Each structure stands twice: as C-alpha cells, then as structure tokens.
Amino acid sequence: MEVNILAFIATALLILVPTAFLLIIYVKTAK
C-alpha cells in the first residue's frame, strides 16, 4: 500500500505542478 500511495502522490504532483504552472501563466497573460 505504501508504494502505491507514494506512486499516486508522485503521479498527482507530476500532473498538478505543470497544470498549476500553466494556470499561473494564463492568469498573468489574461491580466
């Protein structure tokens, strides 16, 4: 279970970090 949880967290970070980065750029560009 621990390995699966770590893999899930790592995957979530890989998805959320670029998404958040793109959202920040979009907000700055929109303004």
From Swiss-Prot:
Keywords: Membrane, Photosynthesis, Photosystem II, Plastid, Reaction center, Transmembrane, Transmembrane helix. It holds the Pfam family PsbM. GO terms for biological process: photosynthesis, light reaction. SUPFAM superfamilies: Photosystem II reaction center protein M, PsbM. The chain crosses the membrane at residues 5-25. It is found in: Plastid membrane. GO terms for cellular component: photosystem II; plastid membrane; thylakoid membrane. InterPro entries: PSII_PsbM, PSII_PsbM_sf. Its main location: plastid. It is a single-pass membrane protein. One of the components of the core complex of photosystem II (PSII). PSII is a light-driven water:plastoquinone oxidoreductase that uses light energy to abstract electrons from H(2)O, generating O(2) and a proton gradient subsequently used for ATP formation. It consists of a core antenna complex that captures photons, and an electron transfer chain that converts photonic excitation into a charge separation. This subunit is found at the monomer-monomer interface. PANTHER family: PHOTOSYSTEM II REACTION CENTER PROTEIN M (PTHR35774:SF1). HAMAP family: PSII_PsbM. Belongs to the PsbM family. PSII is composed of 1 copy each of membrane proteins PsbA, PsbB, PsbC, PsbD, PsbE, PsbF, PsbH, PsbI, PsbJ, PsbK, PsbL, PsbM, PsbT, PsbX, PsbY, PsbZ, Psb30/Ycf12, at least 3 peripheral proteins of the oxygen-evolving complex and a large number of cofactors. It forms dimeric complexes. This is Photosystem II reaction center protein M. It comes from Cuscuta exaltata.
